[in-house]
């Protein structure tokens, strides 16, 4: 029996500085390298990385829900034990701090192990995944792809799709009132790394750009879209400025859409994703030049 239902591990949203200002997040600031391209002399926090914390207890609950759905359990699935290993470090409780993985594009191994009571029987569960993330001091965009695993004698876990988990960060509270900013950075998919070039005109509150260097999609044109205030109703509910389902065109895959957020105290960064319907194609992030 193959378990396609478990082929996509969903990570809950991180509690970042956008929510810590209201008392919901960590009070600790994490040191991170300076972006090196910050032209705003008044930005005294460019060398600080916002907290990027993930609760192990939330991952444990997600695993219970995934198993319950996969096996149509009439009663809630409960884990008697749970551990997750990320980049070689094992966690059984507390928080996982993604900032320790460093800025830039990372592809990190994730292994979850658990003991689960499913329909009255105890099974040892192992799920292997690859975490793809692009991290900047003020933002992060992540994708998770299950690579395999086993649920006791019930069957194997198949390889899953390249799925977006989230893009979040310290949301820009007040947009610049005028001027155009160009953002350059990285775009990525399951195996490739490309480039992002995006420009926002804050006079007109519109943005447009392109992604290049990804053979799977070819060049992606991110068509001009309105910059608006967006309500995010995910795990950490908050608002941010950006683009919601903007129109885009892929050379190889036709019409696609993109979502983009603006992050940092001075609109320092952008991060986002490109998708086609329910299929996630790429993530991206860039900093102000």
Regions found by a protein language model. Give the residues of each.
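C-terminal motif of bacterial Sec signal peptides marking the signal peptidase cleavage site
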Residues: 15-18
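Mature soluble binding/inhibitory domains
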Residues: 20-289
């Amino acid at each position: 029996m193959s378990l396609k239902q478990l082929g996509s591990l969903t990570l809950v949203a991180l509690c970042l500085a956008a929510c810590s200002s209201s008392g919901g997040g960590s009070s600790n600031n994490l040191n991170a390298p300076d972006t090196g391209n910050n032209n705003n002399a008044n930005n005294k926090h460019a060398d600080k990385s916002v907290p990027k914390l993930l609760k192990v207890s939330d991952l444990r609950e997600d695993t219970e829900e995934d198993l319950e759905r996969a096996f149509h359990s009439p009663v809630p699935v409960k884990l008697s034990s749970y551990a997750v290993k990320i980049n070689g470090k094992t966690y059984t409780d507390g928080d996982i701090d993604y900032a320790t993985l460093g800025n830039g594009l990372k592809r990190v191994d994730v292994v979850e192990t658990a003991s689960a009571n499913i329909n009255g029987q105890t099974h040892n569960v192992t799920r292997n995944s690859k975490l793809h993330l692009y991290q900047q001091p003020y933002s992060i965009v992540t994708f998770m792809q299950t690579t395999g695993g086993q649920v006791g004698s019930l069957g194997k876990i198949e390889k899953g799709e390249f799925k977006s988990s989230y893009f979040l960060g310290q949301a820009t509270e007040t947009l610049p009132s005028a001027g155009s900013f160009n953002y350059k950075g990285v775009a990525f998919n399951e195996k490739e790394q490309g480039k992002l070039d995006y420009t926002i005109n804050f006079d007109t509150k519109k943005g447009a750009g392109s992604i290049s260097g990804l053979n799977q999609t070819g060049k992606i044109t991110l068509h001009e879209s309105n910059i608006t205030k967006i309500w995010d109703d995910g795990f950490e509910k908050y608002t941010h400025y950006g683009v919601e389902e903007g129109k885009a065109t892929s050379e190889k895959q036709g019409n696609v859409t993109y979502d983009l957020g603006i992050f940092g105290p001075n609109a320092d960064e952008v991060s986002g994703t490109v998708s086609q319907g329910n299929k996630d194609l790429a993530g991206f992030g860039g900093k102000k030049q």
